[in-house]
């Protein structure tokens, strides 16, 4: 694990519409400066400074039909050994993560669909995957757990180099009250699979998370977005036990 900061730049180009599809391509670079904490069993953790500047090429697509709202995305992330002289050497990467290398490659993809029935009920589904050719440092790994991935578990409880995560959510029609808009109640199933490449002997290298639960979301006064989820884990996680109960809550403002 580690902490740090980053800054970057991105250029985007919107492609011509293909039927009802909206498309966009983007190219970006991020300059990351992190302090990775490396710990061994029965040893004090050490901090490894790590700098790297990955280049990301991405595609995103969006389609809004009469009943379906579909989104998709694919991104390719290329690690660079040194970009304009910025970047740590291979030894620093190997120390931060066994067999990690600054010249890494990551493929990410996601797709989501929201189907609205004639009654106003909705069935929402999404899946995201990540694949790589080698072990990654913590900033590039695939994480699962928490309100926006697998509810019922702690945020980013499980981490892997490759993985897949999916969710299916059945929502009621939207209700409206004075001062309340788009209030829905839903039930869901979340799941994820993650795996480490080249794990150390003492490391657990594979994680399977799954949960079911109930939740509600609403918008108040056209400004506040409120969401509350209850999650029931179906499997043990790294720190969460099967059958534990967890509530997730978020509130945000949009103007």
Model-identified regions with their sequence ranges:
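C-terminal transmembrane beta-barrel domains of outer membrane proteins
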Residues: 92-255
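Transmembrane beta-strand segments of outer-membrane beta-barrel domains in Gram-negative
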Residues: 1-138, 195
